[in-house]
């Protein structure tokens, strides 16, 4: 198990020099952020990013995310051209030495929260999802923008997309995911790229739009499309942990051959599908983080783990969920869990 850290490139207020001072931190998760969704990621851009990271003594190990264009998810007439571009990007990544690529198949909204500055009892600020608040919002008719909404869309473009997806059910979305995977997985397999799908965040339908990657049954259906290990999973404890029915260690054990990337964060489940993102320690949330790491050890997981969202602590400001301080604390906690399970120390929790 190897620690990694999300870095948003030169515009990120968290620097590579700071990241490499985190104990045992050697790997970076990043992406090409200045290319429009659907265009090709060139080798020049990929290798320039790699070089900037390697100059600081770190390794670019995961690309998160290589985004899937909405027209592919919708199955529109131009999807084949967009899929060809996706395949070219995958080839360029593989030929540049990138072997793990994360993506998602969430319609319109990659993730949604109702509050980025929810104050916990200790005074730290965190991300929060209030389901009672969100369920009464219609993005088509309201002027409100919630955290996680793609601001590259105009109000009119977003409304059009949402109305298209409201004509969909889960079967329609599954059909389009299968079409996409049947097209791109041969390229991933050829270049030994583990293509890892991130679960929906949160893992249920919002705004009348279907979501499909949310439970054990979702992964069973995913693997049924193609059983290759390259048809992979990004295992996110925070997203999957929002549903109490998801037994995270059991999911890890069932799908271990397909898990190639792990996001570790804790959440505190509240009533009626609401939740707050807590500190990483097990006792602060609803996810048994030690049980997750032990399950990863049991499947002999050798891939990367990144401390996912952190709280804003000690007066830090910046991109919500992606400050330095609490994610660094999360990394050291994960280090301790790994050391504990590898030495069978039952006192670690």
From Swiss-Prot:
Tree of life domain: Bacteria
Catalyzed reaction equations: D-mannonate = 2-dehydro-3-deoxy-D-gluconate + H2O
GO MF assignments: ferrous iron binding; manganese ion binding; mannonate dehydratase activity
Pathway: Carbohydrate metabolism; pentose and glucuronate interconversion
A Pfam family recorded for this sequence: UxuA
Cofactor(s) required for function per UniProt: Fe(2+); Mn(2+)
GO BP field: D-glucuronate catabolic process
Function field: Catalyzes the dehydration of D-mannonate.
Keyword tags: Iron, Lyase, Manganese
InterPro entries, per database record: Man_deHydtase (IPR004628), Xyl_isomerase-like_sf (IPR036237)
Upper lineage: Bacteria, Bacillati, Bacillota, Bacilli, Bacillales
Enzyme Commission numbers on file: 4.2.1.8
Protein name as catalogued: Mannonate dehydratase
């Amino acid at each position: 198990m190897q620690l990694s850290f999300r870095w948003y490139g030169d515009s990120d207020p968290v620097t590579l020099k700071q990241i490499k001072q985190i104990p045992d931190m050697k790997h970076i998760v990043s992406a090409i952020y200045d290319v429009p969704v659907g265009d090709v990621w060139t080798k020049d851009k990929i290798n320039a990013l790699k070089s900037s990271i390697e100059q600081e003594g770190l390794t670019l190990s995961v690309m998160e995310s290589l985004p899937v264009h909405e027209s592919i998810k919708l199955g529109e007439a131009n999807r084949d051209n967009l899929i060809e571009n996706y395949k070219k990007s995958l080839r360029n990544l593989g030929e540049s030495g990138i072997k793990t690529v994360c993506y998602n198949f969430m319609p319109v909204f990659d993730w949604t929260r109702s509050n980025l500055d929810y104050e916990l009892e200790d005074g730290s600020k965190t991300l929060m999802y209030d389901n009672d608040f969100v369920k009464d919002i219609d993005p088509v008719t309201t002027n409100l923008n919630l955290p996680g909404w793609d601001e590259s869309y105009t109000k009119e473009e977003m409304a059009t997309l949402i109305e298209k997806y409201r004509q969909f059910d889960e079967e329609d979305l599954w059909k389009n995911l299968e079409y996409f995977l049947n097209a791109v997985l041969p390229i991933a397999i050829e270049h030994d790229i583990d293509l890892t799908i991130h679960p929906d965040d949160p893992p249920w339908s919002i705004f009348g739009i279907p979501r499909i990657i949310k439970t054990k049954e979702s992964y069973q259906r995913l693997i049924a499309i193609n059983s290759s290990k390259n048809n992979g999973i990004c295992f996110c404890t925070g997203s999957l942990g929002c549903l109490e029915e998801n037994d995270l260690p059991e999911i890890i054990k069932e799908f271990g051959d397909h898990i190639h990337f792990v996001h570790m964060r804790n959440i505190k489940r509240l009533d009626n599908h609401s939740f707050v993102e807590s500190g990483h320690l097990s006792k602060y949330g609803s996810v048994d983080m030690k049980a997750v790491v032990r399950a990863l050890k049991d499947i002999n997981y050798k891939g990367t783990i990144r401390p996912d969202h952190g709280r804003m602590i000690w007066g830090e400001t910046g991109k919500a969920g992606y400050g330095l301080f609490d994610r660094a604390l999360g990394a050291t906690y994960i280090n301790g869990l790994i050391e504990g399970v590898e030495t069978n120390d039952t006192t670690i929790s």
